[in-house]
Amino acid sequence: MLAVVFTLLLLGACEKVNRLAQAPTIYVEKGSYPESEVPEYLRTVSPDILFVTDRRAVTTREGKMNFSHERSPAMAFGRIEVNLAPGWSWSDLLQEQSANRNRMPAIVTGDAETLVQFSPTPLPFELKNGVARPLPSALAPYQEQKRAFQRRVSAELKRANRRDVVIFIHGFNNGFDDGVTTLANIWHSTGRIGVPIVYSWPADSSGLFGYFTDRESGEFSIFHLKEFLRALSSVTELERIHLIAHSRGTDVATSALRELVIAERAAGRDPRRSLKLDTLILAAPDLDFGVVRQRLIAEQFGPAFGQIIVYMNSKDGALGLSQTLMAGLRFGRISSENLGESERVIFKRIQNVNFIEVEQVRGQSGHAYFRENPAVLSDIALALRTGALPGSSERPLTRIDGNFWQLRKDYPLQVQ
């Protein structure tokens, strides 16, 4: 029981950071922030972040519209203003990104505005010849809600600098604002490419067993995530989806994606083309390594993406305790030394999947490094901006063995 307590406390403690991230190394040392590529309407310290959530809507004590940890049977799509640095101007923010003064003000979010409220699922249905079909009276408004969502995303893509969508799926013990502010940091670090959308599942349960409640809520959310991704991939203007998932969010993401990939292949379609999947980033994945081998690797999950990037830290204390609790090696803690010869052969065959060991991160930052570490933020930015693979001139990571790489503290400045 003591191990359970420590696990939950540490995992929770690593999730509550809502500050402007330290400037990525690439902008401080290798060149200025790419302002010229940022559309005029996005040159602000208070951009809008889009969201899709199946949390229950609430009004906070301060009168703010937000979403709780409770589950909702209906998805909501909307927007929320995120002030990355209250009191700063756009010029102040740019100077900070290039000067590395390490000032990290608290991020402030506004009211969450719902633009499309979806019908609750499952939709009412009837059986005909043994086949369940939604009632037309229920299906018609649901389809119109999807079209309204698609129209808004289409409009955003038409004025963006790229026809890409960057999705973030948070982990355990994250409130709605936690996911929103994390995506705002990552998206800003990339040079604000494409359209940012946070998928916020009903995590952030309190109490000793909140971790387990959140795990179940992740299972609850998988159908809604699939519906969101199906609707999104059908937007004509969309060219590429980049999906970033963290910790327990990697289970929610890969479970939904796995089912979508299976369905697309069964229908005779190439999921990479039909779902427009480009980059999948799994940061500190809280996944059982054995389950990954049998459900993802054995089912050829990888070819559905342009590339898959797994950020790992063998000293990730939160995943270490989760590993003790769940009695299975966590995917976010593996290293090349953990693998037997047969496993090395398997990973070498997976050409578009790369495992990146993040150097010199411990303690609280040992689990949240993907959103706090300037070197990791630099690599995410380079991967999404260029599509380059590790070891290329654009992403000069240090090879450890096969498709295992090391990301040094000063990356991408000095490579040995």
Q: What is each PLM-predicted segment?
A:
Residues 150, 158-164:
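Proline/glycine-enriched tight loop/beta-turn segments at coil->beta junctions
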Residues 174-179:
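Short substrate-entry loop that stabilizes the transition state in hydrolases
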Residues 167-171, 246:
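The conserved beta1-alpha1 loop
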Residues 225, 245, 249, 253:
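Gly/Ala-rich beta-loop-alpha elbow adjacent to hydrolase catalytic centers
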Residues 10-13:
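C-terminal motif of bacterial Sec signal peptides marking the signal peptidase cleavage site
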Residues 140-153:
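Alpha-helix-centered segments that form part of catalytic cores
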Residues 19-133, 139, 158-159, 180-184, ...:
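Lipolytic serine-hydrolase domain surface
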Residues 1-2:
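Bacterial N-terminal signal peptides that target proteins for export
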